[in-house]
From Swiss-Prot:
Keyword Membrane: yes
Protein name: Protein SYM1
Originating species: Candida albicans (strain SC5314 / ATCC MYA-2876) (Yeast)
Cellular localisation: Mitochondrion inner membrane
Record-stated family: Belongs to the peroxisomal membrane protein PXMP2/4 family.
């Protein structure tokens, strides 16, 4: 296990974006696969067992690797360098705690509601070719945005506090991706439960 971690760390240092793109794609795809396995009959209340949808899973992998990972990579670097508590700089522990709290607030009050959740639903709507795109995106927001955001606030703030406080910036997206296996299962379930 230590070898795998050391190898992954070396890849993160040498090629951070590519490493994050591959990791995120695989873990978002894993979340979709779990959603299909655990909630196979959620599509339009169909009671028949549905076969595994490989194209749906491929779309999830594409979203994770090509859309979310580059944005997430930049987002965590932005939070780490630009969202910093500057008052009481003579007390480093206080400054670190307040910077962490501020990062969680920005992440949960800006990124989640206005970037992360809309990006997922609009990207998946387009990747699934649900035309007319704009009408279907608006419908998905109307039916799922608020419930997803409330669920997000149950899962992410506490985790993100520890993520931002304890982990170096290069490992934050990986930590989010690991927790996101469950979160992506939920997102995939919500995305495909109300077409």
């Amino acid at each position: 296990m230590k070898y795998i971690f050391n190898r992954y760390n070396a890849l993160l240092l040498r090629r951070p974006l590519i490493t994050n793109m591959i990791t995120t794609g695989l873990l978002v795809g894993g979340g979709d696969a779990l959603a299909q396995f655990f909630f196979p009959n959620n599509d339009n209340n169909n009671l028949e067992q549905q076969p595994f949808d490989y194209l749906r899973n491929l779309r999830a992998i594409i979203y994770g690797s090509l859309i979310f990972a580059p944005i997430g990579d930049k987002w965590y670097k932005f939070l780490n360098t630009k969202v910093v508590w500057t008052r009481n700089a003579q007390k480093p522990q206080y400054q670190r705690s307040m910077s962490t709290l501020l990062r969680v607030m920005v992440d949960q009050l800006v990124f989640a509601p206005f970037i992360g959740i809309p990006l997922y639903y609009s990207s998946m709507t387009i990747l699934e070719n649900r035309q007319p795109f704009l009408d279907n995106i608006i419908d998905k927001f109307n039916t799922s945005w608020w419930i997803t955001l409330k669920s997000n606030w149950l899962v992410w703030p506490l985790f993100q506090f520890f993520n931002f406080y304890l982990l170096p910036v290069q490992f934050r997206l990986l930590a989010v991706n690991i927790i996101s296996i469950g979160w992506n299962t939920y997102l995939s379930y919500v995305m495909h439960s109300q077409k």
